[in-house]
Amino acid sequence: MTGSDLIGMMILAAGLFAIGLFGVLARRGILFQLVALEVALSGPALAFVAAGAYHADPQGQGMLILVLTLAAAEVAVGLALLLRIRRTAGSDDSDVISGMKG
């Protein structure tokens, strides 16, 4: 992998992170926010793999496995909370949830 390949991958990783962050901030539905958070987490994962490939170091792939594991745990907890909130509030809109007391 050349330096220009690494720069391209880092730009792509930053773009994925920015798109995911925008999705988390712009959408009100919790399900869409979870999907956007997954897109945001794929950016740093791509950066880890690209940096590891550039330096011929397998630690980048190890970090990818860690990021994917954390993302899977985040989705599991997020979906469980989403189901509970939908039963309680009747909606998955984050504005409705912020007004809940208790």
Curated annotation (Swiss-Prot):
The chain crosses the membrane at residues 6-26, 30-50, 63-83. This is NADH-quinone oxidoreductase subunit K. Belongs to the complex I subunit 4L family. One of its GO terms (molecular function) is quinone binding. NDH-1 shuttles electrons from NADH, via FMN and iron-sulfur (Fe-S) centers, to quinones in the respiratory chain. The immediate electron acceptor for the enzyme in this species is believed to be ubiquinone. Couples the redox reaction to proton translocation (for every two electrons transferred, four hydrogen ions are translocated across the cytoplasmic membrane), and thus conserves the redox energy in a proton gradient. It is a multi-pass membrane protein. Its EC number is 7.1.1.-. GO terms for biological process: ATP synthesis coupled electron transport. It catalyses: a quinone + NADH + 5 H(+)(in) = a quinol + NAD(+) + 4 H(+)(out).
